[in-house]
Amino acid sequence: MSEIVKDSLKLKTLWKIYKWKDENDEVSRFLQQGGSIEQAIKAFGEPFGVEEIHGNIALNEGIQLALEIIAGIDTTSSKWSNASAYLGVGDSNTAESATQTGLQAATNKAYKAMDSTYPQRTNQTLEWRATFGSSDANFAWEEYTVVNASSDTGKNLNRKISSKGTKASGESWTLVLQITAS
């Protein structure tokens, strides 16, 4: 009797938001220059909030580009690298759908370039990180994405909705996306 072998690829997604009081953008500058969260805590104290969001939906446009990059079919498009990846946030709570092409907010959405040295890979986990300073994205955070451009004109890999509060001036919020493949 032969053994049945199943092929599968599982992706586990974890979003984290670190919320800092940061009137002078000292924390945001430190993190944007590549300082670790642990170093920021030692230097500036604990964040006033830490949020975790599990899961998301992969968007068709991101899946298709990732497959083309893996196969060498597309060698010219921007990847989700330090040079071209942005984490985006918006205030829309429209349900996720694989056919969406980015954030759904009409006006309140913002994209932030990667903090220095991100994305990073450890074993089977990729991690993107961007820090939104005191004057960035001051609205309700309801939706999240990683995109390979500074707007939804790029290819969005995924989208997640989850209400995590309203960011205000004088605060810096660090958004982290981890995707683990197994």
Where do the language-model regions lie?
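Small cysteine-rich, disulfide-bonded extracellular modules of the LU/uPAR three-finger superfamily
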Residues: M1-W141, N148-S182
